[in-house]
């Protein structure tokens, strides 16, 4: 049921799913099926590698990376991992000792990985965001917002809907309207009906609400401030586009890596961090206050920009070529 099992074949590539799952850290007894699935995944990975005969195997940190890269290494195939977060997951830490190269998105990763293998490449982002040619006026028009909008808040509730962020926005719609804030609100599918009902009750608020934003380039260009979870790719986009942001890390991710990502920015003045537990009370009031301080927003965006690594995909490809001896 995972998205890639549908989208990868549609893009013209074969995909093989592995039955591997993560460990249950609260109830070790539930890990017996996990061990069985790991063995199945190793067997399937070995068969797939033998059939496909790749020149290199690349892992991006998910549990499925472990059996694939382990079997590739046994077969003498070069391996590379990419760590997207500021705090690596268990899989990449286990694989790091035997891979050829480690591409990272944050500085100071020597505490987790062998220093001689680390290359700072950044995280690849969507091509339409790397090469934007959109004016703010065009972006505002795209969302059918008033042309004079000068305090635009972009809220990214996630494709599935981050309930805490959405609830925080919903409970402060009148405050946003009274502060003269214009809202672009991506709710995710699970929250869109509730959000539309709430918006209808505050007609004085200038707002574009949708479950999914197709043109994120327009959304980022329009925004004066972004509210988002702290996933690796969202942060990479925010940094590359030099956007000031308030990050609300999801508490429901392995090893709390979103909090660590957000702290990596907040300690450098590149974002503000509000915890999920604090969000309903603090998130929108702080956003309203921040939008009244354009100079501080500019400074925050510039600090975020210093953490960006443009052309990350090209950097990673270059490392692949080096591992394969195609480029030195």
What feature does the model see in each segment?
Residues 296-310:
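A short, well-ordered alpha-helix in the C-terminal region of glycosyltransferases
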Residues 3, 14, 73-136, 145:
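Active-site-proximal region of nucleotide-activated glycan assembly enzymes
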Residues 44-58, 64-80, 93-98:
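Glycosyltransferases and closely related glycan-assembly transferases
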Residues 54-56, 221-236, 243:
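Acidic donor-binding loop of glycosyltransferase active sites
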Residues 309-328:
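C-terminal alpha-helical cap of glycosyltransferases
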Residues 1-37, 42, 189-191, 276-277:
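Conserved nucleotide-sugar phosphate-binding/catalytic loop shared by glycosyltransferases and other
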Residues 76, 217, 224, 242-244, ...:
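A short alpha->beta transition loop at the rim of the catalytic pocket in nucleotide-sugar-dependent
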Residues 7-11, 134-226, 258-262, 267, ...:
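Donor-nucleotide binding loops and adjacent catalytic segments primarily
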């Amino acid at each position: 049921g995972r998205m890639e099992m549908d989208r990868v074949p549609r893009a013209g590539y074969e995909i093989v799913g592995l039955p591997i799952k993560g460990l249950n850290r609260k109830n070790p007894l539930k890990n017996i099926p996990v061990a069985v699935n790991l063995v199945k995944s190793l067997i399937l990975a070995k068969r797939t590698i033998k059939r496909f005969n790749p020149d290199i195997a690349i892992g991006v940190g998910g549990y499925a990376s472990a059996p694939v890269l382990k079997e590739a290494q046994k077969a003498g195939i070069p391996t590379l991992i990419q760590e997207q977060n500021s705090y690596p997951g268990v899989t990449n830490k286990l694989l790091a000792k035997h891979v050829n190269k480690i591409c990272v998105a944050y500085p100071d990763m020597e505490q987790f990985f062998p220093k001689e293998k680390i290359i700072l490449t950044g995280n690849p982002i969507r091509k339409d965001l790397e090469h934007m040619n959109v004016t703010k006026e065009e972006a505002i028009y795209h969302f059918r917002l008033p042309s004079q909008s000068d305090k635009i808040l972009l809220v990214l509730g996630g494709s599935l809907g981050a309930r805490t962020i959405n609830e925080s926005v919903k409970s402060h719609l009148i405050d946003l309207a009274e502060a003269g804030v214009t809202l672009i609100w991506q709710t995710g599918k699970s929250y869109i009906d509730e959000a539309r009902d709430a918006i209808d009750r505050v007609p004085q608020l200038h707002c574009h609400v949708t479950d999914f934003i197709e043109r994120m380039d327009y959304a980022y260009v329009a925004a004066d401030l972004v509210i988002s979870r702290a996933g690796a790719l969202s942060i990479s986009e925010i940094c590359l586009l030099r956007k000031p942001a308030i990050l609300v890390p999801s508490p429901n991710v392995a090893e709390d890596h979103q909090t660590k990502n957000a702290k990596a920015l907040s300690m450098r003045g590149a974002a503000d961090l509000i915890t999920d537990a604090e969000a309903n009370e603090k998130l929108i009031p702080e956003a309203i206050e921040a939008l009244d301080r354009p100079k501080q927003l500019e400074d925050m965006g510039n600090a975020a920009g210093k953490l960006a690594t443009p052309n990350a995909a090209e950097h990673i490809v270059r490392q692949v070529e080096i591992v394969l001896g195609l480029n030195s």
